[in-house]
């Protein structure tokens, strides 16, 4: 999994935990981003359990892993996947560290400032009046379920990302489609907000 893809996962997992209800049967892209902005209200940290299903284009069977995610304002995100495909990711603003315990691999990347969490927090700190540059965004409501799809205009690893959540704010799934035809579906459960996470809860070792 590349650093850019991990950035997309971390950003949109972070944005959802406290999403407000959508009233309209259809949503504009601006309305969809405003729902994301409202997700920050009153949320200082959160944890959630995840199940990840990875469908590789060259394999018929899915690779299924479980794990957890953690987030703490203003800019720390952690994701851990359990064995047999164990990995840990720590993102602090634009500094990303990936650890593969079984392989003994540890990689650290300094991402461009515009790809860090601080930029997105600044963007979503006020009501959304314009869309972020470089993305096509679609939002819609089907019954009580909200769908938000984000497609980068610049061709890279990710083809599209879709969030599926209930209008009451419960995140259900994160779907990531890559240009190599790989597909990842992350399902969320047991989400807990404002649990009082500290710095020690975001250590890779």
Q: What positions do the PLM features span?
A:
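Positively charged n-region of N-terminal signal peptides that target proteins for export
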Residues: 1-5
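Bacterial N-terminal signal peptides
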Residues: 7-18
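Cleaved targeting-peptide boundary
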Residues: 22-31
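Flexible, processing/modification-adjacent segments and terminal tails
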Residues: 25, 37-42, 47-49, 54-56, ...
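Short hydrophobic/aromatic-rich beta-strand segments that constitute the beta-sheet cores
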Residues: 50, 77-81, 96-99, 148-150, ...
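Short, surface-exposed coil-to-beta transition loops
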Residues: 64-66, 85, 157-161
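An acidic-aromatic
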Residues: 68-118, 184-185
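Gly/Pro-enriched, hydrophobic low-complexity segments
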Residues: 128, 132-205
């Amino acid at each position: 999994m590349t650093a850019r893809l991990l950035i997309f996962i971390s950003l949109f997992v972070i944005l959802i935990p406290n999403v407000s209800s959508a009233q309209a049967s259809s949503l504009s892209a601006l309305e969809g981003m405003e729902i994301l902005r409202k997700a920050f209200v009153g949320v200082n940290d959160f944890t959630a359990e995840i199940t990840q299903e990875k469908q590789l284009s060259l394999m018929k069977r899915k690779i299924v892993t479980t794990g957890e995610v953690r987030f703490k304002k203003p800019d720390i995100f952690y994701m851990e996947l359990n064995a047999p495909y164990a990995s840990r990711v720590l993102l602090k603003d634009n500094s990303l560290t990936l650890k593969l315990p079984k392989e003994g691999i540890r990689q650290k990347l300094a991402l461009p400032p515009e790809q860090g969490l601080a930029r997105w927090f600044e963007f979503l700190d006020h009501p959304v009046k314009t869309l972020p540059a470089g993305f096509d965004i679609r939002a819609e409501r089907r019954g009580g379920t909200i769908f938000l799809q984000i497609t980068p205009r610049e061709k890279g690893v990710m083809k599209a990302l879709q969030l599926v959540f209930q209008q009451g704010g419960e995140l259900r799934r994160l779907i990531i489609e890559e240009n190599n035809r790989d597909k990842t579906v992350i399902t969320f459960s047991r989400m807990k907000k404002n649990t009082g996470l500290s710095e020690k809860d975001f250590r890779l070792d």
